């Protein structure tokens, strides 16, 4: 299979969540992908645990989007500062560079972080990362 070459930061979309554009850091040091989420609340639907959450897809913007997804799992994740946190895990489609594939994403508060989303190693099987490049698939620092 041909792999798509990406830079260390790219614009992507999460179509099942209604997120048309989100700037993400392609982080080979992170095992699991992470998405900024706030106002997180669990609820039951058809006998399954679901989660409702809001996100700010764009840094330094009050624009928010409310999303819902079934909870796939709950995992304890250790962040880069060594802090351990139990996070809900969802599975959703990632669209990047003309490809779409399902990825597992943990939800956490990334409000103080530079990127609203991290793409971890387990979601990179279709990618090759060029660590010195950015936005190889289009866009720039400020827009997709």
Residue locations for each model-derived region?
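Pepsin/retropepsin-fold aspartyl endopeptidases
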Residues: 1-144
């Amino acid at each position: 299979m041909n792999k798509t070459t990406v830079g260390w930061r790219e614009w992507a979309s999460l179509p099942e969540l209604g997120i048309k554009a989100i700037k993400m850091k392609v982080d080979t040091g992170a095992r699991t992908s992470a998405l900024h989420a706030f106002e997180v609340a669990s609820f039951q639907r058809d006998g399954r645990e679901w989660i409702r959450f809001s996100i700010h897809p764009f840094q330094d913007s009050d624009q928010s989007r409310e999303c819902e997804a079934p909870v796939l799992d709950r995992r304890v994740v250790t962040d880069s500062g060594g802090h351990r946190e139990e996070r809900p895990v969802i599975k959703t489609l990632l669209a990047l560079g003309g490809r779409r594939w399902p990825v597992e994403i943990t939800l956490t508060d990334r409000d103080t972080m530079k990127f609203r989303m991290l793409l971890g190693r387990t979601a990179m099987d279709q990618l090759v990362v060029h660590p010195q490049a950015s936005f190889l698939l289009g866009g720039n620092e400020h827009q997709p």
